[in-house]
Amino acid sequence: DMLANVTMNMGGLASDVEDSPFQNWSMILFPYATGDFHSGTGEFRYTDTDGKEKILYHNGYTNYTLAMKKIMEKAGIENADTVLVTGYSAGGWGASILADDIYTNYFPNATNKNVFVDSSMALYDKWYDTAVNVWQSPSSITSKIKTDNLTMDMLRALREKYGDSIHL
């Protein structure tokens, strides 16, 4: 993805520029999102407008988990001290939704935890219903959904869990 390459390698976040404030940080970047914001684990059956039975496959969380296991095996970053979980455009939803999972399961010893969400805000009264019944997201995700603002719910839950030890 060209935009991810520019962001990470050409003067962006993980730049080799001497004065980069992000030098030596480990980063998890979500450049975009799956239809379930990387949080689904199941199938949703429905009938389309022509009366045909259809299935939506929501495997974002399953795929994310497999990818993270492979990344952790290959990258040698399991002892990272400073970590940034970030996403832009629809990837910001993935960053906000999965940051707790990332810090709990992959970087539990990081002392400098950071989450930066860019451009992922949408008000929708049925986030909880969608996450539970359509995407079949894990309860570790759905239990944090309290309002019509999914991103803010996730960020609030991070603040409640980590307090001042996480930078949002």
PLM regions: where:
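Glycine-rich nucleophile elbow surrounding the catalytic serine of serine-hydrolase chemistry
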Residues: 88-99
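Active-site machinery of serine-nucleophile hydrolases
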Residues: 1-75
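Functionally engaged cysteine thiol sites
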Residues: 1-2, 33, 77, 89, ...
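Short, flexible loop/turn elements at secondary-structure junctions
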Residues: 29-34, 87-90, 119-121
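Flexible loop/turn segments at secondary-structure boundaries
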Residues: 36-38, 92-94, 122-126
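Surface cap/lid and interfacial helix-loop subdomains adjacent to catalytic sites
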Residues: 43-44, 54-84, 99-168
